[in-house]
Amino acid sequence: MLTTAACGLGALLVLVRSVSARRAAKEKIQRARTRRTESLHRAEQVVLRYRQSHPSTDSALILSLSLSELTKRLQEDSLSPEEVFYSYMEKTLNVHKELNCCTEILLESFEQLKTISSKKEGLLYGVPISIKDNIAYKDHDCTCGVVVNLEQPAQGDSVIVKVLKKQGAIPFVKTNLPQALLSYDCSNPIYGQTLNPHNPQKTSGGSSGGEGALIGGGGSILGIGSDIGGSIRIPASFCGICGFKPTAATGPMAKDVDSLALCMQALLCDHMFSLDPTVPPVPFNVQLYQSSKPLRIGYLESDGYSQPTPSMARSIREVKALLEQAGHTLVPYQPLRVNKIMTEFIFRGIFADGAISMIQKLKGGPVDPCLQNQVNLYTIPTWLKRIISFLLKPFSPRFPVILDAVSGVKSIPDLWKQHAAVEVLYADYISETIAHWRRCNIDVVLCPMIGPAFNFNYCGQISTVISYTALYNLLNFPAGVVPVSTVTADDEEELKHFKGIFQDRMDKLLKKAVTGAEGLPVAVQCVALPWQDEVCLRFMKEVEHLVKQKRK
């Protein structure tokens, strides 16, 4: 009797705690949404007052200027920081209503604007800049779309925000991202799903998807994202803008390559080097970026692990032809052992603990639909994962290997063994890849970029396609994307016959994910060797220029 009563009481306590935790999470989410609504409302009121007192401000002209043109006019005083700021703030508010891309307006930006004219300095003087939600801004949450991170405001600005402010920029809005940043979709239980600026039935991509949508929709001229597996490049591709992952993981997103280069020039300054000694104290090499020397370019249509969609492959062929016509040399290139690298380094490396750390982070609140399929997979008992993996091996080459990789290691000694083995293999792989580049005698690589934009709820089911982006995070190579085309009716027709390399579930899902994309942007990816960021950007600029010339 006593034992039964004790068990019943224990079960009741667990239930009460669970209900209480869910209620607390719900209340936290509601408070966060209220803060966002209030910040948007206050910004709308200030913009309205400015509009009433400055009816002659030509916002259409301001929004049409490139970053280089805008900074020139700000420096010359032919435009004021106020005119630029309020034009972009108003546009951001309108874009957000359509795409749900912002997590909070940084109301401190109004105060910064008041003092900016007294200190007219910096390469980005008077430029309003958007920043991804996970970038620290004093007194604001870095939620990462996770409930447990709510109401824990940053104690100070991140280094990148400090440098941007020093260069005269005005961070004015934080943008949306997927829950826990472990998806290339853009939805979380706090702020919801961000939509694609070209088609609201498609995702903006992620994890810097709020940035992609806001810039693609015209609400920001320059944004800062982060990229640990393609998180700048994928939303840039999906939203039809340019994005750059430097040798380091945090980088700019904008509508053109010159804007990316100007931002990198602004960031690689003495202030950055003094605040963050881990950044090599090497200023941006403008001469290297502006070089017109013909390049020797390696190119690939497929990495042999994930079959590119028809529009991805076509874009590579078209850009290759343009580059050859412009006098560059194109040679076939194939990355080394992508299949093994994806399994051993990417999946097994990220999920060495069997995804326990990530699941713990999610326990404080609801799981977003864009992450639910992944979480379902991770929470399958390890013994069952291994059985399923064994049974599926004859029928599906990739999924069983991924399932086995995300099962994690069996013990702490095994973790150390894996860590030691990966360290050696990782160093060897980088050396081998660089040696492979040298043998091919290439300066840069042109490769496919994931796209076009996916239909909702597919990103979390297709992990294989990130081979095109995550490989360069692993190698620590600078990589960027440039929009070069749009999906054609012929691409859609060819997609009907798409089988993929392995003809497995992942290939079938990829086909479904990109169906119905006619007219959506398609990009290519440009890659260079470590710390040759200027070379990568110069290559991107060349691609951009040739594509624009062709359109004329």
Regions found by a protein language model. Give the residues of each.
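Peri-catalytic substrate-binding/gating loops that frame the active-site cleft of hydrolases
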Residues: G145-Q155, G243-F244, G298, P310
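Conserved hydrophobic/aromatic pocket- or pore-lining residues that grip, position, or stack substrates
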Residues: Y88, G126, K132, L164, ...
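Amidase signature
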Residues: M1-E121, A266-L474, V484-E518, W531-V535, ...
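ATP-grasp fold ATP-binding core
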Residues: K119-K138, P171-K174, Y191, L446-C447
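Short, well-ordered beta-strand elements within core beta-sheets of diverse protein domains
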Residues: E69-E76, S130, V148-Q152, A249-K255, ...
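Enzymes and membrane/adaptor proteins characterized by extended Gly/Ser/Thr/Asp/Glu-rich
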Residues: L123-V163
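Short glycine-rich, flexible loops that bind phosphorylated cofactors or substrates
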Residues: D139, Q179-A180, S306, F454
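Short glycine/serine-rich loop segments
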Residues: D157-L267, L475-P483, A523
